[in-house]
């Protein structure tokens, strides 16, 4: 199987998000990379499902709460920006203050 660098990055991100989901289900709090992976995966999958940029900007803030992440992570994470592929093309989705 040959993957482009872009496809490799998406695959790695998807795996990181899945690992974060499993850790969260076990009751562990997530670190910064895990939180970013989970939010990013939510946006990419939402775009694939046909949701709008506006919807994803709102729902991206509901993926994690302060109790889901390690202390200090919400303060380190001001924005998450993702280039996602929508049915009508690639768009930049920005989620401001993603962890409430």
Curated annotation (Swiss-Prot):
It is found in: Cytoplasm. InterPro entries: Urease_gamma, Urease_gamma/gamma-beta_su, Urease_gamma_sf, Urease_subunit. Gene3D superfamilies: Urease, gamma-like subunit. Transmembrane segments: none annotated. Heterotrimer of UreA (gamma), UreB (beta) and UreC (alpha) subunits. Three heterotrimers associate to form the active enzyme. One of its GO terms (biological process) is urea catabolic process. This is Urease subunit gamma. One of its GO terms (cellular component) is cytoplasm. It comes from Rhodococcus jostii (strain RHA1).
């Amino acid at each position: 199987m040959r993957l482009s660098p872009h496809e490799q990055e998406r695959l790695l991100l998807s795996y990181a998000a899945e690992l974060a989901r499993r850790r969260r289900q076990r009751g562990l709090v997530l670190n910064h990379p895990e939180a970013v992976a989970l939010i990013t995966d939510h946006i990419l999958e939402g775009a694939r499902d046909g949701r709008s940029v506006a919807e994803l900007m709102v729902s991206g803030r509901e993926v994690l709460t302060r109790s889901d992440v390690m202390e200090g992570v919400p303060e380190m994470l001001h924005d998450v920006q993702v280039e996602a592929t929508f049915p009508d093309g690639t768009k930049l989705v920005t989620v401001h203050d993603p962890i409430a």
